[in-house]
Curated annotation (Swiss-Prot):
Keywords: Ribonucleoprotein, Ribosomal protein
Family: Belongs to the bacterial ribosomal protein bL27 family.
PANTHER family: LARGE RIBOSOMAL SUBUNIT PROTEIN BL27M, RIBOSOMAL PROTEIN L27
Name of the protein in its database record: Large ribosomal subunit protein bL27
GO cellular component term of the entry, any: cytosolic large ribosomal subunit
Superkingdom, taxonomy of origin: Bacteria
Pfam families per the UniProt record, alphabetical: Ribosomal_L27
Keyword Ribosomal protein annotated: yes
SUPFAM superfamilies: Ribosomal L27 protein-like (SSF110324)
GO terms (BP aspect): translation
NCBIfam families associated with the record: L27
PROSITE patterns the record matches: RIBOSOMAL_L27
Length: 84
């Protein structure tokens, strides 16, 4: 009688979809107004000149120009600017 008894089921085997976070436009890149520069959770990058911040902390360009990453302040925060 070489039979197997019914195996128990597992409660694993699921995974969530990737959130597609990260930098979308890098320093020195020329981008149009409205382009998403960074998608992030919290303010890892802070908005600078000619840049807006969405309610989910997405940083986007408000004008056409070149992307610039700058560290400033005592805490060395990274600010993103758009230089025309």
């Amino acid at each position: 009688m070489a039979h197997k008894k019914a195996g128990g089921s597992t409660r694993n085997g699921r995974d969530s979809n990737a959130q597609r976070l990260g930098i979308k436009c890098f320093g020195g890149e020329l981008i149009p107004a409205g382009s998403i520069i960074v998608r992030q959770r919290g303010t890892k990058f802070h908005p600078g000149k000619n840049v807006g911040c969405g309610k989910d902390h997405t940083i986007f360009a408000t004008v056409k120009g070149k992307v610039e990453f700058k560290k400033k302040g005592i805490k060395k925060r990274t600010y993103i600017n758009i230089v025309r």
